[in-house]
Design a protein with these regions (language model features):
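Active-site neighborhoods and metal-handling regions in enzymes and metal-associated proteins
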Residues: 1-353
Length: 353
């Protein structure tokens, strides 16, 4: 039995459940190593089952150990029969399912108690093992190189879409399987929109260019943002940039095992507030990354939780002034017992090209 399944069973026992159905495909992969568009896991103390369909049966047999593997069209009926034959009664399920899927569960598991579970596997995924960390580090190195290469590509007259496409294609050329998310590429006043979509707008001298991008490598993601300037930079632009950079670096300097979620957000936010730009920092400081681009933990001013060694988090302060421009700097960091390790290594000093 692998360590992830054992941790799953320990948590399941704490919740007094006889078994749990997992149908989130990334959680299925996390537990089994199986990657496909159809897969449902059922884990109980005595049996661990993966149900897929005939398209994936060969792959599942090759990729998965420690699970019984079934190819069935009705995965819930298959799992329900197993649960009932075992005499189980209290069955957990992931609560982010459609209404129709829930109705199917009610029919299949009639007579058994169905107990919704929130972020059951996602909570286990917060702490990365050495293999996961190495994979994320590789994804980050691809993003770093793509950014470096983009600096030579960007010229006045290139459009936001052309630059975004360059980043996307370059990451694939460097070994990425795909993108973590649709690349955000915003220049000039568009950079004041934190999640702007790239447009057919040419970049112009004197503009800020914000690039938020990442790639997939062996199913794990990177997530990096850099802001650069084309031709020249004003005093106000430089002041705002250096304020964001100071906030970003302050969190890198202080993030470590045991730091409270509230402080993780407060440390960089206080710097931006003290500089007079607090109202222009309009989003959270960061989130976890891994199999998903946004995953646990998320940070709240009211949370009493603490960050832990093995978490991989984003550090992404920003300032956005409507109608003018914006700045965001984002890094991926690995939390350790004594501090944090910076995984995104692309330069962050104020760059003018």
């Amino acid at each position: 039995m692998n360590k992830r399944v054992q941790a799953f069973l320990d948590k399941m026992q704490e919740k007094e459940l006889d078994g749990i159905i997992i149908n989130n495909l990334k959680n299925v992969y996390y537990l089994t190593g199986f990657w496909g568009s159809n897969g449902t896991v059922f884990i109980s103390r005595d049996r661990q089952v993966l149900v897929t369909d005939a398209r994936y049966i060969i792959a599942a047999k090759q990729e998965v150990t420690g699970f019984e593997i079934f190819a069935e069209r009705d995965e819930l009926a298959t799992i329900a029969k197993i649960a009932k034959d075992m005499g189980l009664s209290r069955i957990g399920f992931e609560d982010e399912v459609s209404v129709s899927y829930y109705h199917r569960m009610q029919t299949a598991f009639e007579g058994l108690e169905l107990v919704p579970q929130t972020q059951f596997v996602e909570a286990l995924r917060m702490i990365k093992d050495e293999t996961e960390i190495a994979t994320i580090r590789k994804a980050c190195s691809i993003s770093d190189q793509a950014f470096h290469d983009a600096l030579d590509f960007i010229k006045p007259g290139k459009t936001e879409i052309e630059i975004a496409n360059f980043l996307d294609f370059r990451m694939r050329e460097l070994g990425a399987a795909g993108l973590s998310f649709d690349t955000i590429l915003a220049s000039g006043i568009n950079s004041s929109k934190p999640h702007a979509h790239p447009m057919h707008k040419p970049v112009e001298l004197g503009e800020a260019i914000t690039m938020d991008f990442g790639c997939l490598y062996d199913h794990y993601v990177s997530d990096m943002t850099r802001t650069i300037y084309l031709g020249h930079v004003s005093d106000e632009q430089a002041e705002i940039y250096n304020t964001v950079l100071k906030a970003n670096q302050a969190l890198i300097d202080q993030a470590k095992n045991g730091l409270g979620f509230r402080d993780f957000d407060k440390i960089p936010r206080d710097i931006i507030v003290e500089a007079g730009y607090g109202e222009y920092f309009t989003h959270g400081i960061g989130h976890g990354i891994g199999l998903d681009i946004h995953e646990e933990p998320y940070f709240s001013q009211t949370s009493t939780e603490v960050i832990k060694s093995g978490m991989v988090l984003t550090d992404e302060p920003g300032i956005y002034i409507e109608g003018k421009y914006g700045v965001r700097i984002e890094d991926d960091i690995l939390i350790t017992d004594t501090g944090c390790e910076l995984l995104t290594l692309a330069p962050k000093e104020l760059i003018v090209i």
